[in-house]
């Protein structure tokens, strides 16, 4: 039976500091925490100061992570989204508080932030922790949590495991991999960063997460009817996805504007509504219009396999065809004697 205090807090966004808010919650009352805190990189929020000293930021991070650890159930799960600057430090802080790291996931988007004096930033770290490594929720049994293997996705091989496989720990997005486009991947996930032109963008928060990404996390690490907490509600994407997937939810935010807009967003959706954005991966390769490779191309083991098993790739991926040709030429000239 739900604690009366928790029951009064559920299915709402609360205006206020998340540390004070979580410290006011019953201990061990939440099943999943997803946190996307400020990165301390000088982003202009309307209330929060995102340019703290390193020492102050880490002390503050330890405080809210400890509060999240306290409210999680013994079999609860904690996900932390963070940028490069403090990913390693916050991983160590989380472990010092008592969390156990299961995976360090990289969410990679190829249309990232352009930089002039360093390599462009095009990824975010997603740290996956559990409170008790001997008892936690990970729904590998759900068909909706599995993805087609390379045999299924690229080759349509009937010998492939019909239930697919579990995703790996690299989640990738390129603009050409949005809905309606073919993704010839074997072991990567494709999720868009929510750009300003995307339909699912809430329009009032510059750091919005995609619903499909949160959907995968919530489906894997919680069950229907369980409670999801977001200490930094922001655009309310975590809570919106939790609601759509039939979870109880609650969140905190310092910004009254974000709280009000998040509440408005939540009011527009019901349990069972579809998640925004393109589901991935594509179930099969669509037919590709256009000419196939030239018949004059020399027949080799490499390019014959490409032409017979993946015709869609021949027209769509000229760079890959160049690699196939290069490999074929190399294999023709290779002999054991060349190694002597």
Language-model features: locations:
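Core catalytic lobe of class I
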Residues: 1-261, 301, 306, 317, ...
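S-adenosyl-L-methionine
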Residues: 2-22, 263-304, 308-323
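Short, flexible coil/linker elements and helix-boundary hinge sites characteristic
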Residues: 268, 330-331
């Amino acid at each position: 039976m739900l604690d009366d205090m928790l029951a009064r807090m559920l299915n709402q966004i609360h205006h206020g500091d998340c540390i004070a808010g979580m410290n006011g919650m019953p201990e061990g009352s939440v099943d999943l925490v997803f946190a996307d805190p400020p990165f301390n990189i000088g982003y202009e929020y309307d209330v929060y100061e995102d340019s703290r000293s390193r020492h102050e930021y880490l002390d503050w991070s330890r405080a809210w992570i400890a509060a999240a650890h306290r409210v999680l159930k013994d079999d609860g799960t904690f996900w932390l989204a963070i940028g490069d600057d403090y990913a390693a430090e916050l991983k160590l802080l989380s472990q010092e508080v008592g969390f156990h790291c299961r995976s360090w996931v990289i969410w990679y988007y190829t249309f990232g932030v352009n930089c002039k004096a360093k390599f462009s930033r095009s990824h975010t770290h997603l740290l996956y922790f559990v409170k008790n490594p001997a008892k936690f929720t990970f729904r590998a049994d759900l068909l909706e949590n599995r993805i087609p293997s390379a045999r299924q996705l690229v080759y349509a091989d009937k010998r492939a495991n019909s239930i697919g496989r579990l995703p790996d720990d690299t989640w990738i997005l390129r603009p050409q991999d949005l809905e309606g486009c073919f993704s010839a991947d074997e072991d990567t996930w494709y999720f868009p960063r929510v750009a300003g032109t995307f339909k699912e963008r809430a329009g009032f928060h510059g750091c919005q997460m995609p619903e499909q990404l949160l959907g995968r996390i919530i489906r894997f690490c919680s069950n229907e009817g369980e409670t999801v907490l977001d200490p930094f509600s922001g655009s309310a994407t975590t809570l919106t996805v939790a609601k759509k997937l039939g979870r109880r939810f609650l969140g905190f935010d310092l910004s009254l504007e974000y709280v009000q807009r998040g509440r408005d967003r939540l009011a527009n959706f019901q349990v069972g509504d579809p998640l925004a954005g393109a589901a991935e991966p594509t179930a099969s390769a669509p037919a590709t219009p256009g000419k196939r490779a030239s018949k004059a191309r020399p027949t080799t083991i490499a390019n014959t396999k490409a032409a017979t098993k993946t015709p869609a790739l021949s027209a769509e991926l000229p760079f890959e065809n160049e690699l196939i040709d290069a490999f074929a030429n190399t294999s023709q000239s290779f002999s054991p004697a060349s190694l002597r």
